[in-house]
Amino acid sequence: MVWLMEALKTKENETTKEKKLTTKVEKSEKKEENVREEEIVCPICGSKEVVKDYERAEIVCAKCGCVIKEKLFDIGPEWRAFDHEQKIKRCRVGAPMTYSVDYNEPIIIKENGEIKVVKIGELIDKIIENSENIRREGILEIAKCKGIEVIAFNSNYKFKFMPVSEVSRHPVSEMFEIVVEGNKKVRVTRSHSVFTIRDNEVVPIRVDELKVGDILVLAKELPNIEEDIEIDKKFSKILGYIIAEGYYDDKKIVLSYDYNEKEFINETIDYFKSLNSDITIYSKDLNIQIEVKNKKIINLLKKLRVKNKRIPSIIFKSPYEIKKSFIDGIFNGKDAKVFVSKELAEDVIFLLLQIKENATINKKSINDIEVYEVRRITNIYTNRKLEKLINSDFIFLKIKEINKVEPTSGYAYDLTVPNAENFVAGFGGFVLHNTIHDKGLSTVIDWRNKDSYGKDLSANKRAQLYRLRKWQRRIRVSDAAERNLAFALSELDRITSKLGLPRHVRENAAIIYRGAVEKGLIRGRSIEGVVAAAIYAACRRCRVPRTLDEIAEASRVDRKEIGRTYRFLARELNIKLTPTNPIDYVPRFASELGLPGEVESKAIQILQQAAEKGLTSGRGPTGVAAAAIYIASVLLGCRRTQREVAEVAGVTEVTIRNRYKELTEHLDIDVTL
């Protein structure tokens, strides 16, 4: 009887605990539901668009990136205690999103004391490729950056050089080109932010919220860093003219003038005579050509790297008078100058901004050659009603056009400027919003139950860490879609690694798969099948050919299922891909067969002739490519058997023989077997 009473008492205690737990869960769910239903407004920009950052249990503004302190998820006292150090970083800018700039956009940087203009894509590609520690966040590649500074404005609206802490890149399928007054332009993604004027304040605005006629903020003048250099005003002016209109080699410097430029001709002759140079003058029609021989000057030009038609770094660091003389030499007393080199035109624009001059840019075509006309403007327009901004380094220009364009390289590029959230880039000095925000340190709990000294933890500590790991897994992967992505992306990495696919193909496949998840196309289909189809589509989009059979073997998914899923994704996601070109397979097949470059070139030539006659239409690209390689190997004496070629190409010997007969007959190729 006693044991029965004890059992009933135990059962009653368990029921009470279960009711308390249920009540606690219901209260927690109700509290979270109230947070969801309550309208959340960003205290910084006033936006109502928010994003849940499950990595840190935060709600983040989708526009400006502010972490909203009052709206944190409540995920338990143990986690809050463990994550206490992160709380001091609340209300920092740290949106889990990315903005982006096109590869070709110019940006002025300071590196190792040198100031130069480079393409942002070229700069970031170099940093990432040389980095030993690349961090990945989804499709984003992020690398630390040291020793590079870019121009950004401070709280007083003055520009200065500031250090870059991180750079990144990610695949992109579209860009938007913004053109403002003076034909200044920049290419960015739709989610990128530029700066405009609202209530006499400079504020960021997304590109997809812009319209023609809106006012954008650009740089009116850039900071000067002056150093004592061994260049005088006369040489600076001649140097500008050499870069614009002259050239030199190991023996001589050649300068060309119009006949009516007598004042400048005499000035040039007098200058070089003062340096004991040998001068020869040639005259033809209305042109005057001056040939100068002076070994010391030629060596100085080589040292300054003048031959590449870019403004030397030393000019960007020169005093105002030297820069002014250099610009006078470039323009040769005229208000406008035509440049064939876009890079030189970009350099001139940035140098003009350093001497507080502005310019318009017009793209023209002369004899089917694209040129860039830069016209100097000394009187800069500013809006006098904006009294707080009159003394700033800004100029305010209206938008003329917003056009959707293709990206230059398939990638978009980002960088982080701490404590500034902006930088200057683009053809004309656009002020762009800081692209990657610093999200602070991530909390990662090690799987080992050891302390910092390597000693084993007590049973209580191990139990606490077990619960913390469980909470971390829950907040990192919080819903079915994220669990799906976590598994799918690991499967994607496995398959692409097995196929030896480059990184940009992996990232394109990830974009396609993520798009399928967001549109709800995964339901009713296997994750492995959709991943394999996304990889096949990415291979075709990036022109890195892989057959369905190869992907089926690597993914362990049936070939027909991959094909069906691929067609479904292409239709629903509007993926437009051209038929695979047999030529794309030639380099890989030739490499695996150990054939020289001559055979590869001959096979490509055969396929080009076949395409012109329509022999590749309706034929499997791998079979046609294999037959062309077989024919080329026989013709050039590097013969491979049909069986060897068939094994590499993944086709049958019968297919090769059939394609071989078609090609030799219709192209009149005489092959001696």
Curated annotation (Swiss-Prot):
Gene Ontology molecular function: any one: TBP-class protein binding
Record domain DOD-type homing endonuclease: where: 238-357
Positions of Zn(2+) binding: C42, C45, C61, C64
HAMAP family linked to this entry: TF2B_arch
Keyword Transferase assigned: no
GO biological process: DNA-templated transcription initiation; intein-mediated protein splicing; intron homing; transcription preinitiation complex assembly
Ranges occupied by Sequence repeats: 490-573, 584-665
General function of this protein: Stabilizes TBP binding to an archaeal box-A promoter. Also responsible for recruiting RNA polymerase II to the pre-initiation complex (DNA-TBP-TFIIB).
One GO location term (cellular component): transcription preinitiation complex
Recorded name of the encoding gene: tfb
Organismal lineage: Archaea, Methanobacteriati, Methanobacteriota, Methanomada group, Methanococci
Protein species of origin: Methanocaldococcus jannaschii (strain ATCC 43067 / DSM 2661 / JAL-1 / JCM 10045 / NBRC 100440) (Methanococcus jannaschii)
Name under which the protein is recorded: Transcription initiation factor IIB
